[in-house]
Amino acid sequence: MTLEQGVGAALVLLFLADIFLTVLYARAGTGLLAPLWTRVIWAALRAGASLFGRRRGPALSFVGPVIVVSLIGFWAFGLTLGAALVIRPELGTTIRPASGDTPTDLVTAMLVAGNSLSIVGGGDYAPHSTATRLLFLVNSLIGASVLSLVLSYLVQVYSGLRERNALALTIDLMTDGTGDAAVMLARLMPGGDSGNATSELGNLIAPLTATKEAHHFYPLLFYFRINDARYAVSRFGFVLLDLVTLIDTVLDQDRYATLIASSPVASLRRGTTLLLETLDAHFPTRGGREGRPEAIWAMRQSIVAAIRTLEESGIAVHHDGVDDYVSRRQAWDALTCRVAPAMGYTMIEIDRRSSAVQSLVKTI
């Protein structure tokens, strides 16, 4: 084996290990090459999307599919190049066409390698020794295996995307399309009756945990950005965290003690936090707005508006929970403020109640 063939074999093994860790081991951040490749493509496409101005959002919605195609192409090129480096020294001797001269350049080697991997057609080149026949056999097995693995991986990615979108739309419908957790809570407790609230919230736990695990299994989901903000992970994550914070701090502690201490409330809080932390840990995010005076003022205005909404719906509240709400919200607000801009959303699109309050203040 020559040095060139050794390098080629190592390159094939490197890409196979990357495919194994990404597709079969399937945990966020475990790939060798794929995480770096997807981040580079994301950064380049996001920078390019800024050239579209107001159409930046729709342009970013194409990033997810483009990254999928680019990653498949990256893997195919890497395997083909590695196999070509192994094949090239054998061209003209143990690997040759049925008739005519045999070019020994790298392009010809890549064409033959692509044929042996079943990626492209490579003419009538054939192996003429036991070792090269075994090489072609191994290459064909690698190509067929990788193709089936990638296809099944794509099915799972898009299945996870569909489930995520379904969860996001469900939560948006429960807010009556407002994106306001106070409206969602008011509709869960019509006339102050919390009888069905626990079961309704419990119905969200299974799809939430499935969405969280889908992002951990299939990191490509991070890069799928829907132009409509209602489908944003940061949007429905914000709504759920705001909802459980309102339940913990604003509802009457005696009348709604069962709801406040219920498992669904605790599960939604923890599950949503885990989902956002997964995105924050494995996706390029930047600092939030924690501790800034204008952010704290906005939180206070937001909770006052939420209390008003709940009172108008006949829900018993206590007004002493404002400081507690602000304190608890500060614990998770910075997380959503990091994730949302990373996906090209503004906090106006995510925190709908605060946006409505600020718009009202400006008109006065």
What are these regions (language model features)?
Residues 26-53, 99, 163-179:
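Membrane-interface amphipathic/juxtamembrane segments adjacent to transmembrane helices
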Residues 200-203, 222-225, 229-364:
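Soluble C-terminal extramembrane regulatory/interaction domains of multi-pass membrane proteins
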Residues 18-33, 76-111:
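Outer-pore turret/helix-boundary of cation channels
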Residues 1-5, 62-75:
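Alpha-helical transmembrane segments and their helix-start/interface "positive-inside/aromatic belt" motifs
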Residues 50-67, 124:
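Cytosolic juxtamembrane amphipathic/interface segments immediately preceding
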Residues 11-18, 68-75, 83, 103-165, ...:
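Pore domain of cation channels
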Residues 39-46, 112-115, 136, 206:
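Short amphipathic alpha-helical coupling elements at transmembrane boundaries
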Residues 164-237, 242-243:
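Non-transmembrane accessory domains of multi-pass membrane transporters/channels
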